[in-house]
Amino acid sequence: MKTLVVDAYDSFVYILVEYLKQLDMNPIVYRINEINIALIEELSPDMILLGPGPGHPKDAGYTEIIHRFKGQIPILGVCLGHQAIGLAFDCKISKACNLRHGKKSLITNDQQCIFQHFDSPCLVTRYHSLIIDKEGFNNDELIITSN
């Protein structure tokens, strides 16, 4: 399995890369300004990971990738990448009411796919200022798998 990791200039992406290596997911890393649709097609990854980074997801450069490969290649977004997926599917991105920079909290999950080996609830460390606002969430293309 080959995993394309798109780095939006955040060092945490390399922790994710190490996890992917441990899972034999063969990560290849490109910075957001080095990647384009043609190169992704040429690389032919089995999965795309859109990494964390600074700023607002509307400015991340991920939207074109999401729209082009949705439904064809599994796409996982972490932090900024997660927010960009929500934005690409017309979800509202809001400032978090309670900032969780480096804070631990319990989340519930559906124990499916990427959560299949996790308890629910499980303890996670969060580091974000923006959220996908679930108030008014009405999207039949996305499924909420954790909360």
Q: What positions do the PLM features span?
A:
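Short gly/ser/thr-rich secondary-structure transition/capping motifs
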Residues: 28-34, 57, 105-108, 127, ...
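N-terminal beta1-alpha1 cap of cysteine-dependent amidohydrolase-like domains
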Residues: 1-71, 80, 140
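Alpha-helical elements of the RecA-like P-loop NTPase motor core of helicases
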Residues: 14, 38, 87, 116, ...
